[in-house]
């Protein structure tokens, strides 16, 4: 019995020794592969932990600090309208975005389009933070637009399939104002946006966020033989007009599109804006001042607004800027109370 156990122990030692020599004698590239695998796993663990910290920090900002920022206000009806499509997940992002603008200029009517995910509590929270804001419920919008789309089946198909189609149709079809601003919920204003305010007061052109090569736009236009309608537009911030809507043209375009995606609306805006060129000059916000995520620049005093593309994840840039805006809003509130 003892001899058997002793024999097994000797064999185990021999196997460990052989295993050691096998590792030493392996080709160097295999050792590198093992090392890289180990480092990759470690990196992923660190990255997950880092993202977890960022998300926790983001949630803390939402639940603790943003609710403490001072109430903003706007005009209930009759002014140029600032339209935003807002979801439950980005509700606090939107509140901070619109407050960052209204602190500089509030002679506007503000419209929130419910994407269908806003809860009753979300709507109460938004109304609490922005006096006189208008919220268009998804059910109400669907009913109104459905009647308009009676003779436009492809427009209805697109709106039913893609939630952000509301940015294309509802902003214009449900607007009471001739002047419309499309504002995404992941934009922050750092300084008084003079170009935007001048347009709201008496501008006559169309002004858009500059994006040099919007995703898929050239390919989309080529497929429907409208290459000459390319505009380097990002609709995250866009100043335009209710008359831009052309349902007959949209029905014709959408009949040629089999599969819609998140970029379809922006691609179609390129066409609509180009068709307006005889009535309104096409212009764009200075990219160094109004920075789209593809054009972010470090520091400096130039930046007036930033668009973060939060849907694809730019927390590294967004969270520090967000904290800065919150701090400025809170400090302004303290000054007002003195």
Where are these regions (language model features)?
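A short, conserved beta-to-alpha structural element at the edge of catalytic cores
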Residues: 207-229, 322
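Catalytic core and acceptor-binding pocket of nucleotide-sugar-dependent glycosyltransferases
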Residues: 212-214, 230-312
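N-terminal anchoring/stem segment of glycosyltransferases
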Residues: 3, 7-147, 308-338
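Active-site-proximal specificity loops/subdomain of glycosyltransferases
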Residues: 128-174
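A structural signal for short coil/turn segments at secondary-structure junctions
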Residues: 105, 130, 175, 276-277
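Short, solvent-exposed loop/turn segments at secondary-structure junctions
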Residues: 89-90, 117-118, 141-143, 187-189, ...
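GT-A fold catalytic core of metal-dependent nucleotide-sugar glycosyltransferases
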Residues: 163, 167-213
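Aromatic-acidic/polar surface patches that form glycan- and anion
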Residues: 83-94, 160-164, 227-231, 258-265
């Amino acid at each position: 019995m003892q001899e058997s156990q002793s024999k097994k122990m000797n064999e185990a030692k021999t196997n460990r020794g052989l295993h050691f020599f096998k590792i030493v004698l392996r080709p160097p590239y295999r050792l590198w592969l093992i090392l890289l695998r180990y480092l990759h796993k470690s990196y992923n663990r660190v990255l997950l932990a880092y993202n977890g910290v960022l998300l926790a920090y983001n949630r803390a900002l939402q639940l603790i600090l943003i609710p403490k920022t001072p109430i903003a206000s706007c005009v209930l009806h009759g002014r140029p309208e600032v339209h935003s499509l807002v979801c439950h997940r980005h509700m606090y992002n939107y509140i901070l975005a619109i407050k960052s603008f209204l602190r500089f200029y509030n002679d506007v009517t503000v419209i929130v389009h419910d994407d269908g995910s806003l809860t009753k509590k979300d709507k109460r929270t938004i109304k609490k933070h922005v006096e006189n804001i208008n919220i268009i419920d998804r059910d109400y919008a669907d009913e109104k637009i459905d009647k308009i789309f009676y003779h436009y089946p492809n427009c209805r198909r697109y709106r039913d399939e893609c939630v952000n189609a509301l940015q294309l149709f509802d902003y214009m079809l449900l607007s009471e104002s001739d002047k419309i601003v499309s504002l995404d919920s992941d934009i922050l204003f750092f300084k008084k946006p003079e170009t935007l305010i001048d347009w709201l007061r008496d501008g006559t052109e169309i002004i858009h966020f500059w994006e040099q090569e919007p995703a898929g736009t050239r390919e989309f236009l080529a497929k429907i033989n409208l290459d000459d309608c390319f505009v380097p537009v990002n609709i995250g911030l866009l100043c335009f007009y209710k008359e831009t809507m052309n349902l007959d043209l949209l029905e014709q375009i959408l009949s040629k599109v089999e599969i819609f995606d998140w970029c379809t609306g922006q691609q179609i805006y390129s066409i609509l804006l180009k068709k307006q060129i005889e009535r309104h000059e096409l212009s764009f916000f200075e990219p160094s001042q109004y920075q789209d995520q593809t054009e972010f620049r470090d520091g400096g005093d130039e930046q007036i607004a930033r668009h973060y593309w939060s849907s694809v994840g730019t927390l590294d840039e967004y969270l520090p800027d967000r904290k800065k805006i919150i701090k400025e809003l809170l400090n302004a509130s303290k000054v007002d109370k003195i």
